[in-house]
Amino acid sequence: MTEIGTVIDGKYEILREIGRGGMSIVYLAMDTHLNKQWAVKEIRKKGNGKNDEVVVNSLLAEANMMKKLDHPALPRIVDIIDNGITIYVVMDYIEGESLDKVLNEYGAQPEEQVIAWAEQLCEALEYLHSQKPPIIYLSLIHI
């Protein structure tokens, strides 16, 4: 786990944790050169599992594939940093609240809003499926 205040690659200052998964932690970071916020996904190369190398290689392949995509509903990958122990994937920071938080705080949303979200999701999936070869997204948890 990277400590808050750490500067990665001489320019990305870690501000706070914004998400966590099985093999990665996502931080909000500030590019100290451009004064711009980014999301930085930290992927530890060694964990406690025997399949760590496979998982890390899979996450790295996903990041390299995402670098080539250009769609307004998908965050751009702008940098991949490998310091030998940890891989950092720097991507667009998209402000807002998670759907889970919106539902917990505000309850069911109006039908028009849900339809608008579904249309945006379908447009992003259509874009992914139109790639050569098609990109099949298996988990919609974090979209």
Predicted segment positions?
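Conserved N-lobe loop of protein kinases adjacent to the ATP-binding glycine-rich P-loop
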Residues: 30-38
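AlphaC helix of the eukaryotic protein kinase fold
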Residues: 44-68
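Activation-segment/catalytic-loop signature of the eukaryotic protein kinase fold
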Residues: 80
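Conserved short submotifs of the Hanks-type protein kinase catalytic core
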Residues: 84-98, 102
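Activation segment signature within eukaryotic-like protein kinase domains
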Residues: 117-118
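Protein kinase catalytic-loop region centered on the HRD/HxD motif
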Residues: 123-136
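Conserved small/polar residues in nucleotide/adenosyl-binding loops
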Residues: 141-143
